[in-house]
Regions:
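Glycine-rich phosphate/cofactor-binding loops in nucleotide/flavin-utilizing enzymes
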Residues: 53-60, 65-71, 75-77, 151-202
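A short beta-strand->alpha-helix segment at the C-terminal rim
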Residues: 1, 5-9
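Structural signal for hydrophobic packing residues in well-ordered secondary-structure cores
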Residues: 9, 37-40, 62, 83-86, ...
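C-terminal helix-coil-helix/basic helical segment that borders enzyme active sites and/or dimer interfaces
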Residues: 91, 108-162
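Short, glycine-/Ser/Thr-/acidic-enriched flexible segments
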Residues: 10-12, 21, 37-38, 136, ...
């Protein structure tokens, strides 16, 4: 079975190496253990009940991801990028503007759904809550894709040497790729929805 144990990362023989992402940030690390000693007194819950603890922990992470918060992210709406960009042709602008408006409508629906689930959760279980992580993180990725598209064909060109809004959009675009993995991938979320909302077999 799997047990959940807390370990002091400051003890000897633990080597932590940050992983630099496309965004330039390093929120994830590789952790190497070389004959590290873990105390049984630091075990959470009973032996072999670690998966239960891990699943409960992931629920909190999914709630955080559903709220579309991310450390170091900037608040740039695609429509604002669109208005200040002159890199698009007239036909392209109309097509992109349509996509942006559809994104804004979906985002508004997500906000309404979050409010509804908060109210429902006070009275018990809210089925819609299980879908929030999936729909909100997918839409957040779409948001940054639209921001990049609004910059035109050279939106991601020479990002390393760029500055200002272009650099911030590029960083957030790359970082957003983690949203549909952290807290349970989109594929895992769809399995949860199919089992607990639709009642389909595992």
């Amino acid at each position: 079975g799997i047990s959940f144990i807390l370990i002091n990362l400051k003890q000897p023989k633990i080597d932590i190496k940050p992983i630099k992402l496309l965004s330039g940030q390093s929120p994830f690390c590789q952790v190497f253990f070389d004959d590290v000693i873990a105390s049984e007194s630091h075990r959470i819950a009973d032996e072999n009940d670690g998966w239960k603890v891990a699943k409960r922990l992931l629920e909190f992470e999914r709630t955080m991801m559903a709220d579309m918060g991310s450390e170091g992210a900037v608040d740039i709406e695609p429509i604002e990028t669109f208005k200040t960009s002159d890199a698009l042709s007239a036909p392209g602008q109309l097509n992109l503007l349509t996509k942006i408006k559809k994104h804004e409508m979906r985002n508004h629906l997500i906000d309404l759904t979050m409010t509804r689930t908060q109210i429902e959760s006070k009275n018990g279980f809210s089925p819609a809550a299980l879908s929030l992580k999936y729909i909100s993180t997918e839409e957040t990725q779409a948001r940054w894709e639209l921001n990049v598209a609004s910059l035109g064909a050279g939106g991601l060109e020479n990002v390393e040497n760029s500055s200002g809004i272009k650099k911030e959009i590029a960083k957030s675009f790359f970082y957003s790729k983690a949203y549909t993995i952290a807290g349970g991938s989109s594929e895992v979320q769809l399995n949860i929805i199919s089992k607990h909302i639709l009642g389909l077999p595992s």
